[in-house]
C-alpha cells in the first residue's frame, strides 16, 4: 500500500499444489504480471494469469519433477519462453507462441541430472539469453545460446550440491558473474573472465 504493509493476502492455485518456485512475467502481454509455477511430485506446471490469477494454462509433460523456472526470449522471436529445471529428467525450454501456447520445446542437459536451480542471463553479451544451472551431486553447467543450439560448459565443484544460482556483475566490468548457493560447502562467486 506504499506504507510498507502487506495486509491483503490472495490465495491462488490449490492447497495441495506442490510448488517449488515461481517466476513473474507478463506472459500474454496484456500489461498484467503473470505467475509461472514449477511444481514437483509429478504435478503439472502452470501459468496463472494476472491480475486475478484464476485463469491458468499448464505447460510441460504434466508429470514433471520440476525444481526451478525462469522466463526469457530464448529464440529472439519476441515471445517469452519458459526454461525449467528438473530432476530425474532433462531440463526443458518451452517456446511461447503468438497464440499463447507452449507446445514447441527443446530438452537440454543430462537426463540423470538433479538440477535444482536455473537462471537466465546474457553471459557473453552477444544479445542472446544464456542458461546457468545448479546441480546436486555433480558439477554445474552454463549453456551459451546462439538461437540454433545450446553449447554446454562445465564449472564448479565435482560433487557439489548447488541449490541456488544467481547472476550479476559483481566486479563492475559489465560482464555477468555467477554466484552459487551450496549445501555442505562454501558458497562461491565465479567471475566472468573467459567470455569477455
Tell what function each PLM region has.
Residues 3, 29, 40-42, 52, ...:
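Short strand-connecting beta-turns/loops that link adjacent beta-strands
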Residues 43-46, 90-93, 139-141, 186-189:
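Structural signal for beta-propeller blades
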Residues 19, 42, 66, 88, ...:
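Short coil/loop residues immediately preceding or within conserved phosphate-binding loops
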Residues 35-39, 82-86, 131-135, 178-182:
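Hydrophobic beta-strand segments that make up the repeating blades of beta-propeller
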Residues 164-170, 175-196:
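Blade-level signature of beta-propeller repeat domains, shared across WD40, Kelch, NHL, RCC1
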Residues 20-29, 67-76, 116-125, 163-172:
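Beta-propeller blade termini
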Residues 1-17, 48-65, 95-113, 143-164, ...:
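Blade-edge motifs of beta-propeller repeat domains
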Residues 31-33, 78-80, 127-129, 174-176:
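Glycine-aliphatic tripeptides that mark coil-to-beta-strand junctions in extracellular
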Amino acid at each position: 500500500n506504499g506504507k510498507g504493509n502487506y495486509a491483503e493476502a490472495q490465495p491462488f492455485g490449490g492447497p495441495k499444489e506442490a510448488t517449488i518456485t515461481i517466476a513473474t512475467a507478463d506472459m500474454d502481454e496484456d500489461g498484467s504480471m503473470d505467475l509461472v509455477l514449477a511444481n514437483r511430485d509429478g504435478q503439472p506446471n502452470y501459468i496463472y494469469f494476472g491480475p486475478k490469477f484464476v485463469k491458468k494454462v499448464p505447460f510441460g509433460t504434466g508429470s514433471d519433477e520440476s525444481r526451478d523456472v525462469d522466463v526469457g526470449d530464448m529464440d529472439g522471436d519476441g515471445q517469452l519462453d519458459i526454461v525449467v529445471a528438473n530432476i530425474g529428467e532433462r531440463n526443458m525450454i518451452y517456446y511461447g507462441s503468438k497464440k499463447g501456447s507452449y507446445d514447441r520445446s527443446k530438452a537440454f542437459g543430462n537426463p540423470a541430472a538433479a538440477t535444482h536451480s536455473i537462471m537466465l542471463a546474457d553471459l557473453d553479451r552477444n544479445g542472446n539469453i544464456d542458461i546457468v544451472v545448479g546441480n546436486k551431486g555433480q558439477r554445474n553447467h552454463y549453456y551459451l545460446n546462439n538461437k540454433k543450439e545450446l553449447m554446454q560448459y562445465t564449472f564448479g565443484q565435482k560433487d557439489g550440491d548447488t541449490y541456488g544460482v544467481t547472476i550479476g556483475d559483481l566486479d563492475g566490468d559489465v560482464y555477468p558473474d555467477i554466484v552459487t548457493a551450496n549445501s555442505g560447502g562454501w558458497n562461491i562467486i565465479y567471475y566472468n573472465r573467459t567470455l569477455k
